[in-house]
Amino acid sequence: MRIDLLTREYPPHVYGGAGVHVTELARVLRSLGPDIRVHAFDGPRKPGDEGALDGVRGYDELAELDGANAALRTLGVDLQMAAHTDGTDLVHSHTWYANFAGYVSKLLYDVPHVVSAHSLEPLRPWKAEQLGGGYRLSSFAERIAYENADAIIAVSNGMKDDILRSYPSVEEDRVHVIFNGIDLNEWRKPSTEDEKANQARVLKEFGIDPDRPTVVFVGRITRQKGLPYFLRAARQLPRDAQIVLCAGAPDTKEIAAEVDTLVKELAADRDGVVLISQMLPRTDLCAILDVATVFITPSVYEPLGIVNLEAMAMELPVVGTRTGGIPDVIVEGETGYLVPIEQKTDGTGTPIDPEAFESAMAERINAVLADPGQARQMGKAGLERARTEFSWDTIGQQTLDLYRALVG
């Protein structure tokens, strides 16, 4: 059986959770036997690049669309992808960036189309800041793919509910919940001499004190990640708490400016505020997470949040917003705490009472910081939950079973 995976991100060009998901899914599916082909953005992979494997094809944007709206350039890549999926038994697309390629492949070659829902355009209206009129185009591409897909994979129960609410014409029996996963062999505490030496280098380079209680945020600077709410909540944390922000790749100039101002204000009021704006390799991120006390996910929209699984794999308690798929990951009072939130129903996820949300967030972070023993127990429980509930082997087999049911 030949399976073609269609994706915006694939090594060496991985920017977020969807890229991590496709990379790991392709790896485990190959081990289960199918012929896996990967079609990705960002051009052909060069020999020696991570991701330069047999069956991986990268596409450049069409030169004729140079300077056009970003969403239009995306559809140009999608059409190239669809031209090269002939001969497959099934196409599986990830995010709106590749969904149109899956839809066109289904029409051209009469093969099943599976869509994985990592996010939903109707629940990200702030994308209009980034794409302008292209947001209407991205929304169209997603809607037509979802309404015509043979199966939709939701990465959490919260995401399934969001799909059915956002696209009422989609029948519930077409939506299957298969979680994101985590590779515990990759996400682990530094143990070898080389890893510990690298950790010492990383901590020194960024000025991180391993002996201070530390709160860590990891994520892109986007509206959905909710970083401004955490930066305001951080004013209520103990003065000895160190705040490490692994935050970069802002969606827009507006959100970048807002975060920059809030970080400067926080740093002017207290010491121990560390901003790391570049994307870190996994080993460096593990080095930082290893000395953390608690991980924070202040998102106002989060289908699941692979970063939560990464933090749990590093034995960290997680404090996250009670929204989207986060409650599928965090067990309240056992692996961390859920922050209550009342949100506007206009699709933005904006808290109705931002100050109450920020205070509730600070309260739960402070509860972890105040009890190091309980924090360690939560971290151990989180690791065990990651091991038993979010194994890539399990997720790969569930996905392959769905493929087989569709192909027959």
Per-range role (PLM):
Residues 111-112, 122-144, 161:
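Nucleotide-sugar donor phosphate/pyrophosphate-binding loop at the beta->alpha transition
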Residues 256-279, 283:
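Nucleotide-activated donor-binding/catalytic signature segment of Leloir-type glycosyltransferases, i.e.
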